[in-house]
Amino acid sequence: MNNLSRKDLALVSLMLFSLFFGAGNLIFPPFLGQSAGTSTWVTMIGFLITSVGFPILGVVAVAKSSGLHNLASRVHPLFATVFTILIYLSIGPGLGIPRAGSLPFEMAVRPFMPEGLVSHGLALFIYTFIFFSVAYWLCLSPSKLVDRMGKILTPTLLILISAIFIASIFKPLGSYGEVTGNYIHSPFVSGFLDGYMTMDTIAALNFGIVISLVIKSKGIEGEKAIVKNSVKAGIFAGGLLIIIYSMLAHLGATSGGRFGATENGAQTLANVMLYIFGDGGAVLLAVIFTLACLTTCVGLITSCSQYFVTLSSKVSYKAWVRILALSSMILANM
């Protein structure tokens, strides 16, 4: 078989979208829109090149090379080993995975916790324990990831974000705010740099192997067929990212006209949610942050475990999942 069915292509594409769409992707566009104001759409062109275009190219490059190690081997075998290990460690257990567990708590749960209910440390521990337990369970069966993420987690996330945008149409925030900072003189370049800061270009080097393995599990064989289907999934996922990023940037731009400048994108989103949904907006925001970070966390743990198991057959895939989930939970609480 050379082509994924429409259903499988949609599921793989949704899974790829959810792998990329983490907490940073949720807060960058609103903050960009608020800061860029009337120059939002010029800024977004630059942002989309590095936050969508580059990552999709990365997925295709890794798929075509049958893994990051093979891609880097074109330089030198030793370089490939060192480079690949550093990439997986830095974007995985060294930063990305622990941050995926702690960031939604700090951004969307802690600010709305009743004072004196429980200590910050205990609340964070409880949250991250539940978070990484769910992530661990999801990662145990890589073959089921596409169904669990593509059928449940990602559609839920998309529905919730779309609901915010639709609600903002019926309860508009206002007009676009004024252009501020670097966006005044160089909106395109500023957006270009902001898009790179999502770190998805680097993450794509990790996720490429996950997508290739998922496509193979659907009965696709041969390098050309895998690359072809990776491109299709990338285009579909990229289109979804563009739509969602544009929605979030619009919300941020209109919030600037009503609330003025905020310190970060999380605060911008919090203002929008409270204005549109009232107190219930805090709960909705916490759910969105958690889902966005959970899907990215699952992708990182899976990709890192898949690679590390190739370095030593003495440690199984499930053991690596256990090690990464536990160590990341500990780091998230430090």
Model-based region annotation:
Residues 6-16, 41, 78-91, 122-129, ...:
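Select transmembrane alpha-helical segments in multipass membrane proteins
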Residues 9-47, 57-61, 65-71, 211, ...:
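Transmembrane helix-boundary motif of multi-pass solute transporters/channels
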Residues 11, 48, 52, 83-86, ...:
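Transmembrane alpha-helical segments of multi-pass small-molecule transport proteins
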Residues 11-21, 167-174, 183-251, 286-296:
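Hydrophobic, membrane-embedded alpha-helices of multi-pass small-molecule transporters
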Residues 32, 102-122, 216, 297-324:
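Helix-loop-helix connectors at the membrane interface of multi-pass transporters/channels
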Residues 36-37, 41-125, 129, 133:
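Membrane helical hairpin/interfacial module
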Residues 62-71, 131-153, 217-220, 330-334:
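Membrane-water interface regions at transmembrane-helix termini and the short interhelical loops
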Residues 69-73, 244-294, 310, 314:
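TM-loop-TM module centered on a large, flexible mid-protein loop between adjacent transmembrane helices
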